[in-house]
Amino acid sequence: MVSDFFFPQPGGIESHIFQLSQRLIDLGHKVIVITHAYKDRVGVRYLTNGLTVYYVPLHTVYRETTFPSFFSFFPIFRNIVIRENIEIVHGHGSLSFLCHDAILHARTMGLKTCFTDHSLFGFADAGSIVTNKLLKFTMSDVNHVICVSHTCRENTVLRAVLNPKRVSVIPNALVAENFQPDPSKASKDFLTIVVISRLYYNKGIDLLIAVIPRICAQHPKVRFVIAGDGPKSIDLEQMREKYMLQDRVEMLGSVRHDQVRDVMVRGHIYLHPSLTEAFGTVLVEAASCGLYVISTKVGGVPEVLPSHMTRFARPEEDDLADTLSSVITDYLDHKIKTETFHEEVKQMYSWIDVAERTEKVYDSICSENNLRLIDRLKLYYGCGQWAGKLFCLLIAIDYLVMVLLEWIWPASDIDPAVDRVSSTFKISKQNFDESLVLTDPKKKTKIKTACLKDAQ
């Protein structure tokens, strides 16, 4: 698994990679994760079930994405892949340059590749044009592509000019046991609306800023709980100050993923004002916690939950405010029942199912033959009149770099890594102490604390 987005940063892609890796390990596969360093988290870390994570010291430029390195990442990537005896490289995220680099190097080394797209992009603005061209470059020689929704699949096929037969739809999921409802935590005096999101423009925070004062004026018994961080947090604070809503709009800042459920069970309604969304795992988590979901009707959101669990609004201030006001009235009149939501969601979404479907994709690409270099160059040449020639040059240089690395540091000289996936890493409350063969109680306590911190 390769992506710029992984723990300790919270988010949907991060959670997807971790949970999918855990379930694949349970199915008997060896899985490692390659990501960039996060502050002092550098080097190799071992997480739950012996999941090995390589935090590579690379510089980030924007929203935790690394600067495109192309060839400078190749030596360490090659070393990791050979050490761990990797056969399939699975990248995540269109905006992850680390993912794109890894897929290109993996194909040069003759490895099988898979890519999962978690986002939707347009076709008109400059940022989308550059991203789409980069995606087309990388996807020209990828073995298979996975999308998290049918809307995302259509978007990715158009952006990367892919054969639809090479693109599958496998949704996100959740661990339902970690998102159980608790009605006793919700306020009896107020109707609480929860928002958990990164506070960026594309997440619809401007809509949220416009809607909150209107709803608070119309419904005196409503309050908001907002969790998340980002550049729009300043605008939210200013809105709170302007309308004097400090006692009705609570801002929690960034929360860890293991704290999301504790925030959700404080509410009755979950509001999701995003302007673009490929799937929206947080919607499933909210419904599992027994919250009624209100969301903008964008992207793959309509595919996520059945109609009795959610209500949609256009991504406009007036329509979102009217829809939210209508749901609040229905909720106060006891017309909305959420008692069965958790069991329904538990039956609909499972990481085991996601892992088994992903495993079938892996099996299918393992039977494919690797292309010769000349055939790969033909695929890249079709990426555009000028871009095609540039991409061919990059691939040719990448091949020469691989030959040079093999001459300087032959694969036979790279020591294989120890297989860490064993029962001693399957830590539970009952057998944790027994899994650590240490005689010093003080050292055992320190290691226990460190391991639990990493596992979180």
UniProtKB/Swiss-Prot annotation:
Alphabetized GO MF terms: phosphatidylinositol N-acetylglucosaminyltransferase activity
Enzyme Commission number: 2.4.1.198
Reactions catalysed according to its record: a 1,2-diacyl-sn-glycero-3-phospho-(1D-myo-inositol) + UDP-N-acetyl-alpha-D-glucosamine = a 6-(N-acetyl-alpha-D-glucosaminyl)-1-(1,2-diacyl-sn-glycero-3-phospho)-1D-myo-inositol + UDP + H(+)
Swiss-Prot/TrEMBL keywords: Glycosyltransferase, GPI-anchor biosynthesis, Transferase
Pathway field: Glycolipid biosynthesis; glycosylphosphatidylinositol-anchor biosynthesis
A GO CC term attached to the entry: glycosylphosphatidylinositol-N-acetylglucosaminyltransferase (GPI-GnT) complex
Family to which this protein belongs: Belongs to the glycosyltransferase group 1 family. Glycosyltransferase 4 subfamily.
Subunit relationships: Component of a Phosphatidylinositol N-acetylglucosaminyltransferase complex.
Name of the molecule in the record: Phosphatidylinositol N-acetylglucosaminyltransferase gpi3 subunit
Organism whose genome encodes this protein: Schizosaccharomyces pombe (strain 972 / ATCC 24843) (Fission yeast)
